[in-house]
């Protein structure tokens, strides 16, 4: 077995491996999703986790009179259109949370499935983050409320106005995902490939 030692450059630094150098120079684009049957928040962010660029965010609002199957189809279609338009490198979603109602859990799981299918149909890797870890990454405490998350998202991203709650959650998920591009932060944020 032969071992080669990297030579220092003229500046005295060791060169970066080509795969890492490429990763550091290319801006990652992420589609972040806060899935729900009636109000799915989404955000598209790009770039360095310390200074990301917001390419867009909104909430997919589905009226209550629309049957759940049609709502899920609409969510998937909307997300597919976003994927085609923005061409994200990866997708980040909120992990499953504990809820008291079985009906709510099933509904949330169905919306999440619509998002996962939209990403899988386009060959995108999907990563999930627990709400607690997202709050920790953005606010600094895992028990932050929605208003604190929205405030910090606005401040960190330099937004002119506070985004709607579900969109703010998606922006926070996107910020956490960009932070997790650092391997150490990925471990702290408990980044999981879905």
Where are these regions (language model features)?
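Phosphate- and other anionic-substrate recognition elements at nucleic-acid/protein interfaces
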Residues: 1-14, 19-194
């Amino acid at each position: 077995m032969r071992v080669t030692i990297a030579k220092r450059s003229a500046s005295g630094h060791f060169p970066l491996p080509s795969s890492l150098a490429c990763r550091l120079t290319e801006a990652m684009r992420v589609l972040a999703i806060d899935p729900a049957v009636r109000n799915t928040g989404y955000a598209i962010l790009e770039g360095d986790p310390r200074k990301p660029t917001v390419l867009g965010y909104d909430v997919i609002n589905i009226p209550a009179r629309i049957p759940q199957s049609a709502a899920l189809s609409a969510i998937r279609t909307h997300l597919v259109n976003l994927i085609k338009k923005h061409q994200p490198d990866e997708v980040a979603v909120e992990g499953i949370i504990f809820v008291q109602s079985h009906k709510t859990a099933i509904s949330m799981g169905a919306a999440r499935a619509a998002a996962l299918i939209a990403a899988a149909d386009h060959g995108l890797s999907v990563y999930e983050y627990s709400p607690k870890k997202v709050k920790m990454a953005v606010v600094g405490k895992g028990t932050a409320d929605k208003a604190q998350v929205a405030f910090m998202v606005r401040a960190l991203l330099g937004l002119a106005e506070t985004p709607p709650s579900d969109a703010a959650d998606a922006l926070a998920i996107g910020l956490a995902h960009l932070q997790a591009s650092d391997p150490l932060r990925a471990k702290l944020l408990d980044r999981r490939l879905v």
